[in-house]
């Protein structure tokens, strides 16, 4: 289905053309004065200069050319040259009837849909997920769903931090704590144990202890570097121990991400890119892009059009060590071979904007990707506490992600118990649904690039622009439909008879347009803005229109069909945001 706004443009473009003006001036927008009209066209104002006519003359000429049109119940030219438009009730009902029957409620696949690698998550193994990992996971999961909704083949890759010094630190600490382990015995030739010699809790204790110790103990730090070297050069014991670290960590990560309703298609990491580094470096060198700078191998990426300095991208340090840029470029080589994507999207903290700008420029200059491959980075803002600083525990430490989820769920559970509207059997699942809505909507309703304040009281409120308010609207519609008790599939959506009904129908008609905006801009906040407007219109409609006591059966069936369509659209949209609605609240 075409967007309603595009259908309006087709009518206005034809009228502008018939009146002797360029059709492009027929673009319409939502009215910023809904008390006067629903849509408006300012094309006459823009055309006045080109055609040396007063805007109101042009507007009147276009209005005459438009004539009687079934799309509009009213069209008028007003000073200084606006065209004010109201959609015909019959046309609006017809549009929604078609929308209700169409796949995806009329939203169509992007004609340019392609294969997209979406790189999000990015946790380090052997470390617990904390609140700093929340935004990448939540935004990434939503974008993955939105991209797929419009027909793209999306590969979600977690890109684990599973290589480097952190591994050597853990191994050196383990060697001191458990010296009898066979992994550190150079003479050991047998099979290594199938079970890991540690739990996830032990791992999460060992790493920070080792990291702190390395800053005080030079000999220990040197041993950690030696263990890292041995791992990266394929020593049998270190490799076996590393596999245990990876397995135990990934099992815990999967449990935590599953608890958040986030999933990944590919669980690869920095380690998987290592074998592609020589090939990548050879390609970059062959292009003549590398220069030596103080013993390091770098690629200058500054361009004449840059307003500020963009430093060279360092590929190999003077001591031979590689960096994140090296790994990211090698990962691109790997992904090109495995997936042949037409688009890459990376989600990280916005402090990495420069890093990705450097990486993308090297990838293009070296021909690691084709000239028309899209390379994109979304740098997200910080989740802050009410003090405006990065969110912490009450003790001032970094809060674990599972602690945050538990805190939000407990808070929501206590609110549900106060209302006593849910049975004990349904309580855990209902609380989880509402907690996820509070947490995810609270994040996603903000522009990804902006910082936001985490406010549990506000995010979990059942009123206002919140996830629980959206869920409340869906659950209330389900309750009304259950009381109505008849199938709505065969009901005819009739033209609106009240302002509240028409407003709800107008908002419904904009679903595809709103979701396309979210897709085009990689901005889930556009989905949130849309469903808040839709939920508000729905609540006003069923508050002012007595659906269950309506005596006219045909009209009542139409009301039921309308709110059922609203429910379906809302549920489609919250699925794109990564949460779902309970049966009761």
Regions found by a protein language model. Give the residues of each.
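Short, charged, solvent-exposed linker or helix-capping segments at domain edges/interfaces
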Residues: 94-99
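Non-catalytic interaction-recognition regions
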Residues: 1-93, 107-585
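A short, compositionally biased domain-edge/stem linker segment
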Residues: 101-106
């Amino acid at each position: 289905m075409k967007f309603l706004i595009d259908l309006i443009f087709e009518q206005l473009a034809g009228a502008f053309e018939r009146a002797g003006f360029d059709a492009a001036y027929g673009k319409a927008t939502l009215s910023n004065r809904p008390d006067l009209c629903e849509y408006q066209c300012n094309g006459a104002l823009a055309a006045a200069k080109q055609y040396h006519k007063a805007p109101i003359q042009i507007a009147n000429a276009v209005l005459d050319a438009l004539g009687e049109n079934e799309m509009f119940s009213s069209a008028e030219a007003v000073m200084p040259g606006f065209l004010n438009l109201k959609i015909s009730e019959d046309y609006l009902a017809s549009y929604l009837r078609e929308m209700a029957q169409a796949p995806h409620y009329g939203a169509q696949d992007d004609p340019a849909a392609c294969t997209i690698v979406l790189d999000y998550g990015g946790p380090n193994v052997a470390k617990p997920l904390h609140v700093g990992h929340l935004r990448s996971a939540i935004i990434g999961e939503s974008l993955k769903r939105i991209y797929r909704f419009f027909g793209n083949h999306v590969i979600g890759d977690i890109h684990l931090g599973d290589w480097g010094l952190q591994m050597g630190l853990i191994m050196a600490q383990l060697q001191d704590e458990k010296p009898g382990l066979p992994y550190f015995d150079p003479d050991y030739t047998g099979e290594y144990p199938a079970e890991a010699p540690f739990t996830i809790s032990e791992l999460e204790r060992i790493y920070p202890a080792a990291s702190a110790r390395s800053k005080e103990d030079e000999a220990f730090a040197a041993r950690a570097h030696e263990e890292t070297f041995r791992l990266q050069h394929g020593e049998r014991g270190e490799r076996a121990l590393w596999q245990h670290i990876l397995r135990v960590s990934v099992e815990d990560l999967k449990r935590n991400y599953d608890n958040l309703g986030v999933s990944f298609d590919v669980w690869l990491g920095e380690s998987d890119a290592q074998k592609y580094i020589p090939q990548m470096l050879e390609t970059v060198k062959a292009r003549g892009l590398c220069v030596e700078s103080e013993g390091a191998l770098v690629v200058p990426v500054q361009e004449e059009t840059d307003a500020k300095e963009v430093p060279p991208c360092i590929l190999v340090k003077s001591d031979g060590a590689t960096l994140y840029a090296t790994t990211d470029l090698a990962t691109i080589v790997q992904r090109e071979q495995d997936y042949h994507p037409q688009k890459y999207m990376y989600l990280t903290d916005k402090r990495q904007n420069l890093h990705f700008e450097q990486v993308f420029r090297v990838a293009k200059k070296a021909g690691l990707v084709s000239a028309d491959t899209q390379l994109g980075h979304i740098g997200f803002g910080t989740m802050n506490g009410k003090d405006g600083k990065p969110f912490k525990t009450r003790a001032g430490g970094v809060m674990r992600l599972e602690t945050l989820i538990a805190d939000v769920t407990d808070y929501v559970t206590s609110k549900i118990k106060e209302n006593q509207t849910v049975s004990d059997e349904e309580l855990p699942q209902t609380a989880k649904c509402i907690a996820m809505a509070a947490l995810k909507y609270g994040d996603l309703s903000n522009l990804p690039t902006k910082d936001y304040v985490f406010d549990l009281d506000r995010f979990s409120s059942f009123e206002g622009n919140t996830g629980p308010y959206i869920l409340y609207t869906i659950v209330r519609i389900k309750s009304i439909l259950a009381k109505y008790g008849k199938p709505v599939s065969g009901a005819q959506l009739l033209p609106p008879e009240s302002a509240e009904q028409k407003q709800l129908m107008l908002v419904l008609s904009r679903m595809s347009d709103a979701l396309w905006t979210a897709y085009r801009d990689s901005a889930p906040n556009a989905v949130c803005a849309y469903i808040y407007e839709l939920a508000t219109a729905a609540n006003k409609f069923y508050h002012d229109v007595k659906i269950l006591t309506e005596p006219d059966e045909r009209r009542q069936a139409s009301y039921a069909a309308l709110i059922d369509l609203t429910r379906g659209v809302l549920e489609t949209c919250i699925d794109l945001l990564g949460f779902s609605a309970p049966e009761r609240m």
